[in-house]
Amino acid sequence: MFMINLLLTIVPILLAVAFLTLVERKVLGYMQLRKGPNVVGPYGLLQPIADAVKLFTKEPLRPLTSSITMFIIAPILALTLALTMWTPLPMPHPLINMNLGVLFMLAMSSLAVYSILWSGWASNSKYALIGALRAVAQTISYEVTLAIILLSVLLLSGSFALPALITTQEHMWLIIPSWPLAMMWFISTLAETNRAPFDLTEGESELVSGFNVEYAGGPFALFFLAEYANIIMMNIFTTILFLGAFHNPLMPELYTINFALKATLLTISFLWVRASYPRFRYDQLMHLLWKNFLPLTLALCMWHVTMPIITAGIPPQT
């Protein structure tokens, strides 16, 4: 039964990822006043299938100088971790109900750094290595703020379990009292998933595509799938944390529709940001985090710790 549940989770994720690539190309197309893909199938709807067939039927070339084992393991690890992170997400019922779901998510996103590092190192190409080092530095840096923002939200929720956040937000979304945290969280998720304007790992002008420069065909497609699965997962996580949908046990479908709609809108906002903003310079990226976000999130975390203690002495206002 568990295997069926697992498949019923993984297959829709991969389908969502496939069509997200199409949505991205369409959104970017219309924002640049052009059509986007519209040849394969009606309105270009079969484009992702054509892309998948093309990528997976190509010969996976391996450079002679590369470390073969690590070169092949890296993309598989990237996709495995990207899919594993979906297990504790309540939609409205998680695949595995974990007591420490949030901690599990953080641990998995930290492990994702290794797949990037290995892919850059195993390629034995200077561009791939520079891209991987940039990606690792960026991902590790932004995880610091993500962890602190999560801690602040969990202080309001009072539990590490993700379903508890649904209960916390029955009366009000957490984005309303803690909107500065939500804004910083959104920007940090952009940086964490290596999306524009923080896609310095893939700086075409200087790095020829970054850590996946030596990958072609299937392994490249695995990295691609992992990246987009992470984007959708991060937006779902944002929805759970700050835009909690109302859950009525008698009508769980309503929760799922509400939840999916919010996550979709957030994902489209990722694409909107990509179409609107130019790429950051690397020092600006690091400056934004260490000089601006980190002090602010620490201050807000202290605020979230002290507020319940201060207000605990006030008698209930009935």
Curated annotation (Swiss-Prot):
Membrane topology, from the record: Multi-pass membrane protein
Gene transcribed to yield this protein: MT-ND1
Localisation per UniProt entry: Mitochondrion inner membrane
Name of the molecule in the record: NADH-ubiquinone oxidoreductase chain 1
BP-aspect Gene Ontology terms: aerobic respiration
Parts of the chain that traverse the membrane: 2-22, 68-88, 100-120, 146-166, 171-191, 222-242, 253-273, 294-314
E.C. code: 7.1.1.2
Keyword Cell wall biogenesis/degradation set for record: no
PANTHER family for the chain: NADH DEHYDROGENASE SUBUNIT 1, NADH-UBIQUINONE OXIDOREDUCTASE CHAIN 1
Catalytic activity: a ubiquinone + NADH + 5 H(+)(in) = a ubiquinol + NAD(+) + 4 H(+)(out)
Record-linked PROSITE patterns: COMPLEX1_ND1_1, COMPLEX1_ND1_2
Key word RNA-binding present: no
GO cellular component: mitochondrial inner membrane
General function of this protein: Core subunit of the mitochondrial membrane respiratory chain NADH dehydrogenase (Complex I) that is believed to belong to the minimal assembly required for catalysis. Complex I functions in the transfer of electrons from NADH to the respiratory chain. The immediate electron acceptor for the enzyme is believed to be ubiquinone.
